[in-house]
């Protein structure tokens, strides 16, 4: 049986980590693509040389030509400029939109059957543009946002409660940015909703509010500490979880940036929502009831994403 083929567009810190994780999890053969000559080849060779030690069999190919991604089953896009201290995700819009146009053309030509995961920021606008540039069906193009945001929220809560991260489940909706909406009443520890844990004295509402804000600022916190780049371990792990659910038809319920067609009152935009990811890509979008305050927060988040999409159209009118 032929191995799956995973194409990584962008061979920076996230791309290299993605390649290593794909090898460790034995998801398939990996093509690292980058416009910088030598970078994908060097990282691919380095990871391949670790395979005898880590005990996995996979082929790693570095390339500077999109032809190398031909026939890929999964394409994960990290290409673009990363955040620097003081930058918001939105500051990257103009530069990375041009990158998405080139990437979209490459995918359209060489990997039109692939399941595409976009990581490039500002995420919700970039995945929206990438789907349009590539022409791929919307259920086969998603953005990595909610899995990462949820992971951060889960980790911060596990620290607060001094429990295993495995016993914490959370719910994060909306855009991947300052306006994301972590939903406390749909988030639990061992099945106990967070508001009940506040009543039980496990934490205070003030502490919970601070954790929610820290989740919103999670990416910026790491950018501020690293100073020369942005997060890469957790984003890569999050995208690999999505790819694995698709390749193995696991049908995981994962929060991703998916194109909505009326759910939550939104049409033709990519927004973070819970989905079922299986062999057909986005197989279901789960729509939950929101109270008045949650709906207001969600609508604010959607409006922020809509503004970014309008800005994209201003730069590239063909997206309209």
Curated annotation (Swiss-Prot):
Annotated catalysed reactions: (S)-malate + NAD(+) = oxaloacetate + NADH + H(+)
UniProt-annotated binding residues for substrate: 83, 89, 121, 152
UniProt-listed SUPFAM superfamilies: LDH C-terminal domain-like, NAD(P)-binding Rossmann-fold domains
CDD domains: LDH-like_MDH
EC main group: oxidoreductase
Enzyme Commission number(s) from the entry: 1.1.1.37
Keyword Transferase: no
Keywords from the UniProt entry: NAD, Oxidoreductase, Tricarboxylic acid cycle
Catalytic-site annotation from UniProt: 176
GO process terms (BP): lactate metabolic process; tricarboxylic acid cycle
GO molecular function, a single term: L-lactate dehydrogenase activity
InterPro entries according to UniProt: L-lactate/malate_DH, Lactate/malate_DH_C, Lactate/malate_DH_N, Lactate_DH/Glyco_Ohase_4_C, Malate_DH_type3, NAD(P)-bd_dom_sf
UniProt binding sites for NAD(+): 10-15, 34, 96, 119-121
Top-level taxon of the source organism: Bacteria
Cysteine disulfide partners in this protein: none
Job of this protein: Catalyzes the reversible oxidation of malate to oxaloacetate.
Family of the protein in this entry: Belongs to the LDH/MDH superfamily. MDH type 3 family.
Full protein name: Malate dehydrogenase
Organism: Brucella abortus (strain 2308)
Biological classification of the source: Bacteria, Pseudomonadati, Pseudomonadota, Alphaproteobacteria, Hyphomicrobiales
């Amino acid at each position: 049986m032929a191995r799956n083929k995973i194409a990584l567009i962008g061979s920076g810190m996230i791309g290299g980590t993605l390649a290593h994780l794909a090898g460790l999890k034995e998801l398939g053969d990996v093509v690292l693509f980058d416009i910088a000559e030598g970078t994908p080849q060097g990282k691919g060779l380095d990871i391949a040389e670790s395979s005898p030690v880590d005990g996995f069999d996979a082929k790693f190919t570095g390339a500077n030509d999109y032809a190398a991604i031909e026939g890929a089953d999964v394409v994960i896009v990290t290409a673009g400029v990363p955040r620097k201290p003081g930058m918001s995700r939105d500051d990257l819009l103009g530069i990375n939109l041009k990158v998405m146009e080139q990437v979209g053309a490459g995918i359209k030509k060489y990997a039109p059957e692939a399941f595409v995961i976009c990581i490039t920021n500002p995420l919700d606008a970039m995945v929206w543009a990438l789907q349009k540039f590539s022409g791929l069906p919307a259920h086969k193009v998603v953005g990595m946002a909610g899995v990462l945001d949820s992971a951060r929220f889960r980790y911060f809560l596990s620290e607060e409660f001094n429990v295993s991260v495995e016993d914490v489940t959370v719910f994060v909706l909306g855009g991947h940015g300052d306006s994301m909406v972590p939903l406390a009443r749909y988030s639990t520890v061992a099945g106990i909703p967070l508001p009940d844990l506040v009543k039980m004295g496990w934490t205070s509402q003030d502490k919970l509010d601070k954790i929610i804000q820290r989740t919103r600022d999670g990416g910026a916190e790491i950018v501020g500490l690293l100073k020369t780049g942005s997060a890469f371990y957790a984003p890569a792990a999050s995208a690999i979880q999505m790819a694995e659910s698709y390749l193995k038809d696991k049908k995981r319920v994962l929060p991703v940036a998916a194109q909505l067609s009326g759910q939550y009152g939104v049409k033709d935009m990519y927004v973070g929502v819970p989905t079922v990811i299986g062999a057909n890509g986005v197989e279901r979008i789960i729509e939950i009831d929101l109270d008045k305050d949650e709906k207001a927060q969600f609508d604010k988040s959607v409006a922020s994403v809509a503004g970014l999409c309008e800005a994209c159209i201003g730069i590239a009118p063909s997206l309209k």
